[in-house]
Amino acid sequence: MHDIRWIRDNPEAFDAALGRRGLEPQAAALIALDEKRRGAIAAFEQAQARRNAASKEIGEAKKAKENARADALMAEVGELKTKLPEMDAAAKRLEEDLRKELAQIPNLPLAEVPEGADEHGNVQHHVYGEPRSYAFKPKEHVALGEGLGFMDFERAAKLSGARFVVLKSGLARLERAIGQFFLDVHTGEHGYTEVNPPLLVRDDAMFGTAQLPKFREDQFAAGSLDAEGQGYWLIPTAEVPLTNLVRESILDEKELPMRLTALTPCFRAEAGAAGRDTRGMIRQHQFTKVELVSITTPDESRNEHERMLSCAEEVLKRLGLHYRVMTLCTGDMGFASQKTYDIEVWMPGQISSQGEGGMYREISSCSVCGDFQARRMDARYRGPDNKPHFVHTLNGSGTAVGRALIAVMETYQQEDGSIAVPDVLQPYMGGLKVIERDR
């Protein structure tokens, strides 16, 4: 959510930043709506003040036996009492109209974010490692998983429809091992506190992190309302419950940075991805992810962003996976983001659009959101000046467990179709070194 006062003071800068995202200028329309709102509030307050003053004057007129004046004042007060609820409602409608307009506008990109219309405008930041070489043609994860008998899309479709999978035996265990490994590193070495959050959240929580109202079609609604009339939603990412833990609160600066992590199922309708990645586990309605969330001060949020990226990278390094980090351009970064790094892991079995073997696939996005989400959540901290200020929020995948499973399968595949277990995962697998078909 944007600060309308900042927009009033900086209309040209606001429109220029929107232009970098490929959007039309909106400052003038927002300022005009805000002027209407402020005018309605001022008129209501003036009428309220006049009612109070006239009520006081009635007593004075009666005391002075000025009956005609007292009658006129009582008539005026009666008229104001009738008008005031209407004026208050009009002011509140304009307040809500402005809020709705602001809620539809994405965050403003930082100055250093590269400009571009889509993913083709993203800029490579750095690369880690080299792709492995194989004495055979690497298979994709679907062929590997089905060959082992541990990955079943057909039975999943009978249960739940398209974009679901049933994992079993060695692959189910491997996915669990990856998630536990990620959590152990982030909590044991990176200073994140593990949280086990609800998987159902209310409208307010989804609004706070900016999934609602703009991306309603991409979410799974639970189809029921709570006692206050709010809807329930399956979480699309643990970012939602973790970030909303500080909603409507004022933290002490000593509590910051607050670093939280969770391993949860995530649920996405993928309405905007129809026809994309329909084969395999790349894009699922249900998947597992380790999420990283940081709540910090404005002065520290940029440093925290770099730190979060390094934490996400570290777990991939220990898995021995080759990847690259991309700085997303203005046309490709998320709605709530000021700046985003994507980590794209190399998957040797994937076939690119050019028909070549091997391609990079996103496995993590790390974003700094400034105070954009904090304003929607009313999340603040009290600094040395003893005044409340909005916190800055950051979120990142640490990382997507399903895609990490794919990367491990394709990277560590052997010619006979078995999967070598990375050294760091073997303790989580009871010492198992190779995943083979059950005999």
From Swiss-Prot:
It is an enzyme of class 6 (ligase). The keyword Endoplasmic reticulum does not apply. Its main location: cytoplasm. InterPro entries: aa-tRNA-synt_IIb (IPR002314), aa-tRNA-synth_II (IPR006195), aa-tRNA-synth_II/BPL/LPL (IPR045864), Ser-tRNA-ligase_type_1 (IPR002317), Ser-tRNA-synth_1_N (IPR015866), SerRS_1_N_sf (IPR042103), SerRS_core (IPR033729), tRNA-bd_arm (IPR010978). ATP binds at R268, A269, E270, E362, I363, S364, S365. CDD domains: SerRS_core. Catalyzes the attachment of serine to tRNA(Ser). Is also able to aminoacylate tRNA(Sec) with serine, to form the misacylated tRNA L-seryl-tRNA(Sec), which will be further converted into selenocysteinyl-tRNA(Sec). Homodimer. The tRNA molecule binds across the dimer. This is Serine--tRNA ligase. It comes from Afipia carboxidovorans (strain ATCC 49405 / DSM 1227 / KCTC 32145 / OM5).
